[in-house]
Amino acid sequence: MPRAIDLAAAEAMPEEVSQVRVILRRFLRHKLAVASLFVLAAIVLIAILAPVISPFDPTDIEVGNDFLAPGSVGRDGVRIHYLGTDTIGRDYWSRITYAARISLTVAVTAQVASVIIGILVGSISGYLGGTVDAVVMRGVEFMLTIPQLPLLLIISSLVIQNQEAIPVPEVLTNFMAWLLLIQPRDAVQVVLIIAILVSFGWLQDSRLMRGVVLSVKEQTFTEASRALGASDLRIILSHMIPNAIAPMIVSASLGLSGFIIYEAALSFLGLGIQDPTPTWGNMLSAAQSFMFQHPWLPLVSGTPIFLCSLAFNFVGDGVRDALDPRLKL
């Protein structure tokens, strides 16, 4: 008998391993997704190592050294401005690396929070059904009919102008200040921008989660769990959410590009994170007036936005293809 059990276990293990291999093989066949993953890994590595690879503090100003060309030597005669300096003499490479840290943190945090809220709302709405489902989903659909960017601009304008009057938990600002290496007063803006992005980011995720719940709750295994006395919470945690993992991963990977663009757009228009805290959006905004005299400034600050948004989309496409059970090997 023990030998029979061992043989059964040995036969089951390759199935699990082979499923992982199948998913990995599907993803690796998507050449653009693989290349994009390497691009994102490089940008994330730069963001993590920003304090190490940046020769200057991103907010330090060298008076009289504004608009230095890439490769110029700093005032101390030792350190080099690899990408030159900006309009007031701040090292551009240092600001780009720290901006990567901030912009990516905003996008990832907003996406994670949106997925969590979307899972909670979608699970409750789909599982309870009836009046609760009708009211919640009509509200979600109404909010989705509103153009998001104009509304985000209005909300951001009101929030940024009145940020002193908005209570933000000190633990959040201190954590963001520590993570992003910025002042706590500047971290308040980061927290508020994340909250603004999340306010609309969870809507699509909630609809996706509701669809999964409506499909799974009528399945035989769900009815069996209910008949055995499993609580509603246990059914949601053990059946609904696990079945939503794959579509949620795809949605999150595709949604990150949107958050990158929205954050950059808000900062570019002066309604997001404010200078001197560097983000790709506010750096591009400051550089646009000097597009012809100093073309490297908008080029350097705009390229990461383009690369990240494109790379996240390609990775999302690759993940979707890899997790699609209908796709042939």
Describe the function of each predicted region.
Residues E15, L37, G84, Y127, ...:
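Small/polar loops that bind or transfer phosphate-bearing groups
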